[in-house]
């Protein structure tokens, strides 16, 4: 027998081993040579190869507020289709291409769409980016020494070197000594 594949962009053959190389349709012809008792014979069949569903997966990401921008990278990817990213909450993370920029604490679901290619269907998946709150940096809030009977005085709020908008509150560990 001899085999012939019409479109070798779809399949190739070596002996009687057929290897699929792409999605689409082609015909395969098998031919048998004549012998003393039989004429030459051939038979053609059609081979249809469907596009595959690609594997596309991402790990969830945990960052801290103030972290630098980072690239969202696939954990597993079988297709070469282009990727587009979109986020559910830009106040937490904004997306430009595959770069994520941390904007605030919270969680955002990132949807990733992959385009169709010659051999793979389009697909989509998602991941969650969680941004943790961080402790603010406070300085210039020093111990105070006073003498009993001194008049009341104003406590100056500590200075901060961040964009924290939280309100300062004060409390005394021993209200019998000092009250606020």
What do these predicted regions represent?
Residues 1-180:
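Solvent-exposed beta-strand/loop surfaces, strongest in extracytoplasmic domains of secreted
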């Amino acid at each position: 027998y001899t085999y012939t594949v019409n479109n070798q962009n779809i399949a190739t053959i070596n002996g009687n081993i057929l290897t699929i190389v792409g999605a689409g349709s082609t015909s395969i012809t098998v031919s048998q040579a004549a012998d003393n008792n039989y004429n030459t014979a051939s038979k053609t069949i059609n081979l249809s190869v469907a596009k595959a569903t690609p594997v596309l997966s991402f790990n969830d990401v945990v960052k801290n507020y103030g972290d630098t921008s980072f690239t969202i990278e696939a954990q597993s990817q079988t297709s070469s289709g282009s990727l587009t990213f979109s986020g559910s909450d830009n106040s937490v993370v904004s997306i430009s291409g595959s770069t994520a920029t941390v904007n605030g604490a919270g969680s955002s679901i990132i949807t990733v769409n992959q385009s169709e290619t010659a051999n793979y269907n389009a697909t989509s998946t998602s991941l969650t980016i969680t941004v943790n709150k961080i402790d603010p940096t406070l300085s210039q809030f020093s111990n105070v020494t006073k003498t009993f009977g001194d008049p009341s005085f104003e406590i100056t709020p500590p200075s901060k070197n961040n964009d924290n908008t939280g309100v300062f509150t004060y409390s005394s560990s021993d209200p019998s000594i000092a009250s606020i």
